[in-house]
Amino acid sequence: MSGSGRKDFDVKHILRLRWKLFSHPSPASSSPAGGSCLQQDSGGGSFEHWGPSQSRLLKNQEKGSVSAFWKKPSSSSSSSSSSSSSASSSPFNPLNGTLLPVATRLQQGAPGQGTQQPARTLFYVESLEEEVVTGMDFSGPEDKGLALKELQAEPASSIQATGEGCGHRLTSTNHSLTPQSDLDSSSSEEFYQAVHHAEQSFRKMENYLKQQQLCDVILIVGNRKIPAHRLVLSSVSDYFAAMFTSDVCEAKQEEIKMEGIDPNALWDLVQFAYTGCLELKEDTIENLLAAACLLQLPQVVEVCCHFLMKLLHPSNCLGIRAFADAQGCIELMKVAHSYTMENIMEVIRNQEFLLLPAEELHKLLASDDVNVPDEETIFHALMMWVKYDMQRRCSDLSMLLAFIRLPLLPPQILADLENHALFKNDLECQKLILEAMKYHLLPERRTLMQSPRTKPRKSTVGTLYAVGGMDNNKGATTIEKYDLRTNLWIQAGMMNGRRLQFGVAVIDDKLFVIGGRDGLKTLNTVECYNPKTKTWTVLPPMSTHRHGLGVTVLEGPIYAVGGHDGWSYLNTVERWDPQSQQWTYVASMSIARSTVGVAALNGKLYSVGGRDGSSCLSSMEYYDPHTNKWSMCAPMCKRRGGVGVATCDGFLYAVGGHDAPASNHCSRLLDYVERYDPKTDTWTMVAPLSMPRDAVGVCLLGDRLYAVGGYDGQTYLNTMESYDPQTNEWTQMASLNIGRAGACVVVIKQP
């Protein structure tokens, strides 16, 4: 290697070395300090040849590792510059009976100095698989990009080293001396891996491209010709790889015409194939993504999709969603669709919405996930779209109107539609309007009129709130809310203090927290929580302290039913008038009840189950506010305390709870669910819960019942399940953030 002053071995040089070593031996006594002959050690052992044996190299190649290579010291015109080696200083001295399998060289000081440089070894770092001799000092002179190191040998058993600039490691083990005859068959071998080889190679190919050298294909798109190298294009594009390696005509053509691709986008992607660099711009990103999809460049497709995700806005999300669908970019389409659903109120105010084709609009109208406050909003959006181009779009009106939940519109809107000019002469539209009017006029038949148009959209059903309850910390003070669209629970606020066995009602989208106990005493206090402002207001207290009471709203006022005052079970009932903000007593129940379930149905207040001090109850009675009287109903099939009660489609449901007979104080937790039909005054067993739940919170959200939390005998539950009356099945839903038993669950339409 000329850069280091050494000369590479050739065949003549090897023969000359053999001649010096074996054909013309010189006496040890005649060799001066600068003699040119190597001598054997005093032990009489033979030298190992310089460098690893051929068999060792082959063995290492089979293992996938590479041994070090060696170079002979440079020779001058006077071969006497080489130094003789003694047994004590020779680098070939055995280490525990073995020698390093690396080439060594003796470096002699300046003539006449008599000093000897330490033995050093040149090696190339390649394998990461084996152990090598340790205790060596490394230095790393660079030689025109070669990843070489110089190694100073010291006695040791193993070594690990990392080659400078390439991240590889030479590994080796100690080896015994090999026969001298190996020198005759061995050859000089080198193993090398360039640093940044691929980068440098592609940079050179880029230069060839710029100079239009060695180009073997020309891509023609429009009026533009783009030269390139087939190998480079095939290495990054599966499209070109298939083209150039298949038996198609393009595989042999020097000029290939590209159809359906933007010229600038193709140019950018060809440059990307050579450089790995790409500039993304808002005005060209769609052409670039379309070209990348065609040419099958997955890396480019991914970065373009992420770039478009960042550009999503109510004014362009519909276009991006349609474009992603056309290109088969599934992830981008999902993100754009979710963005559209979430921001639909802003989307319908933009030009893109008005320009939607009818096929795309019906997908929006049919979705349960559009984030609208009510069905009326969707209806007005449809009317706005139709009026934008009335002559062409009237023919699509009946098809699109079928995706509007007309039965859920206010009756006054339906009355106006019947004589509207757009619908008056359309028979299909008239049928849809009549169906919706029947739904309002015949509420008792609604269970027979169920259809996709009677199912409310997720965002219109309101938000489910879970307030307080017993947890592992002896009383939860957090308020969580559940969003049906996202199927997630999040914390919505905090209570003013700890309350257990209290009641909650909703008036004007505000939570009224009533009674309960704080762990020491039974409460009669009342507080009002505003979810919008997250503020609490103290209201006048009840006349009676109550925990384990039932609370509900009936025709405006709030009713607080039964409970326990700390001394006895109660049958008294109080009513809160929102106008006068006063509590007054109404008629008392027939039976004292605590841990009672209450619900309003068909203008009556139902009081279900509970405990009377001796056992759990199966009885139920109802209160008529117009007569101020309580009347008994048919009893439940099961006795239940801590029962959850809610109404759905004209039926009353009793869910979970516990049964503790008077003769046995051990409670039996229940997973039974019963349904009461007020028309026939009968109870019917329906599908049970997935697990027993005592002190379970139950309410109606949309068209389903939700059972939240509870106690299973060992754990305060954070699970929730929903009941579909149409299929008579319970389904697991998202879990609360903490387990709660006795939590009050209510729905607020507009949180």
Curated annotation (Swiss-Prot):
Record keyword Ion transport present: no
Biased composition (Low complexity): 25-36, 74-90
MF-aspect GO terms: actin binding
InterPro entries reported for this sequence: BACK (IPR011705), BTB/POZ_dom (IPR000210), Kelch-typ_b-propeller (IPR015915), Kelch_1 (IPR006652), SKP1/BTB/POZ_sf (IPR011333)
Kelch repeats: 463-509, 510-556, 558-603, 604-650, 652-703, 704-750
Keyword entries, A-Z: Actin-binding, Cytoplasm, Cytoskeleton, Kelch repeat, Repeat
Tissues and organs where the protein is expressed, per its UniProt entry: Highly expressed in brain.
Region (Disordered): 25-54, 69-98, 157-184
Signal peptide limits: none
Biological process terms in GO annotation: adult walking behavior; cerebellar Purkinje cell layer development; dendrite development; locomotory behavior
GO annotations of cellular component type: cytoplasm; cytoskeleton; dendrite; neuronal cell body
Protein known as: Kelch-like protein 1
Organism lineage: Eukaryota, Metazoa, Chordata, Craniata, Vertebrata
